Regions:
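Alpha-helical solenoid scaffolds
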Residues: 1-290
Length: 290
């Protein structure tokens, strides 16, 4: 299978019909790769299918493959499929020209995993109601996967998913604040997310920083408190608590009343000192002018 697709990559698209009449039908070869979970090789057949079988068939195959790659956490490959699907949804009126022009580049990505330059995502440009049914299918698959990861607090996978597919996490968080992104209980969330992220590794800390930045951009307090605590970002917590003393009081009581959070008592003491200092400075600045 790899040999056939490698030959196709080096062959002018005008000769693909002859090549696959001898090697076998492209859809059948795609299906065999798909069933064997050779997803990267299967992806290389999609542009061949677009040219030989038509855009509708190739889009159907790409959507199936997108779902499968997400299920296997193959997020770089999923990102390439997303870009193909969005492009094909716009440009298949010129299918033959586009297939010949894009096939070496697209197949090169899939065969050799070469790095790509990040561009602004097409997923950010329109609201759901403005998108075509074809693009809606892509969006629905991506959002369903994001909800699956968020609900299970699989946060490192969520970060990899967002980076690989350029999924619009900010828009998703704004929409799902009371849905799949909601944290029901601070104590259980802090314990579970701490276990999931394993904060003693550099990559997990980088993932947490990535998520914290997004949560701050949408002012998602519950998540900010959890992630800033795990990262011991005292300055973030002080900035939040000095504007919300009720939240500070609840936070302090929770950390002190659960033995599992004893590791954060030093952070709590530092926060108390800093907030007291902030309060004193505020009183001085608001005091009577002599």
């Amino acid at each position: 299978m790899d040999v056939v697709v490698s030959v196709a990559r080096k062959t002018d698209g005008r000769h693909w019909a002859d090549l696959f009449s001898a090697a076998g039908r492209s859809t059948e070869m795609f299906e065999e790769c798909f069933q064997r979970r050779w997803y990267r090789t299967a992806a290389c057949y999609i542009l061949v299918i677009a040219k030989l079988e038509g855009p509708a068939v190739s889009q159907y195959c790409a959507l199936r493959l997108l779902q499968a790659t997400l299920d296997e956490s193959l997020y770089e490959l999923a990102g390439e499929l997303v870009r193909f699907l969005l492009r094909s949804g716009r440009d298949f009126e010129n299918a033959n020209t586009d297939s010949e022009k894009l096939s070496p580049r697209f197949m090169g990505y899939l065969l050799f995993r070469s790095p790509y330059k990040r561009q602004s995502s097409d997923l950010k440009s329109n609201s759901m109601k403005e998108l075509s049914p074809h693009i809606n299918s892509v969006m629905n698959i991506l959002e369903s996967h994001a909800s699956y990861l968020m609900s299970g607090k699989e946060l490192s996978k969520l970060v990899a998913f967002v980076k690989g597919t350029q999924f619009d996490l900010v828009e998703y968080l704004q929409r799902e604040r009371q849905g799949s992104a909601r944290l029901e209980n601070f104590a259980s969330a802090l314990e579970l997310i701490g276990e999931k992220l394993q904060m003693d590794t550099l990559q997990s800390r980088l993932d947490a920083e990535f998520l914290l930045a997004h949560m701050c951009s949408v002012k998602f307090k519950e998540w900010i408190v959890v992630l800033a605590t795990l990262l011991r970002r005292a300055e973030v917590l002080v900035d939040l608590f000095r504007h919300d003393l009720r939240l500070w009081k609840a936070y302090s009581i929770t950390l002190q009343s659960h033995d599992v959070f004893s590791e954060y008592l030093d952070l709590l003491s530092a926060l108390e000192e800093e907030l007291s200092s902030v309060s004193d400075r505020t009183l001085q600045s608001n005091g009577p002018v002599s």
